[in-house]
Amino acid sequence: MEPQPLELEQVSGAYDPKNRILYVQYRGHITSEITTQVYAWISALISTYGLVPVQGSIFDFREVTNFVVGNLSTTQYQSYQLNNQVDLSDHPVALLVNNIYQRAMVKAALNVTPQQERKRIVHSMEGALAFIHDWHQINRQAG
C-alpha cells in the first residue's frame, strides 16, 4: 500500500517508491500552520510505514516567496519533537533552494534544528539525489 500524498495549496508531498525518496514541495508563503501540517504528515507516515524503505527526503523551497514570521520557531519545535520520537540520524535531507532569500531562510532553520550534518542545501534535483546517494555511501563505509 502506497503512502497517502499530502496535497494543500502551499505544499504537496509524496513518496517516490522508485528512488525511495520522500519529496515535499512548498509554494508561496510558508506559515507555521503549513509547517505543522507537513510534520504531522511525516510523523503519520513514519508511524504507519517506518523509515526503512526511505533513503532520504527532499524539501523543495524553489517556489517559496515568503517564510512568514513564526515559522522558524515552529520548524525548530516540530523538528525537535520528531527527532525525539524517531532516530533520524541515518536519514539524509536535501533542502532545494533557488535564490539567496530562500537559502538564507533555510540556513537559519538549519541552525536551530538538530543533526545538521545529515542535511544539506542544494540547488538542483540532481544535487539533491546525489547528496542522498553520497550520504549513504560515506556512512556505509564509516559504519
Question: Could you say what each language-model-derived stretch is?
Answer:
Residues 2-143:
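Amphipathic, Lys/Arg-enriched alpha-helical "gate/interface" segment within cytosolic domains
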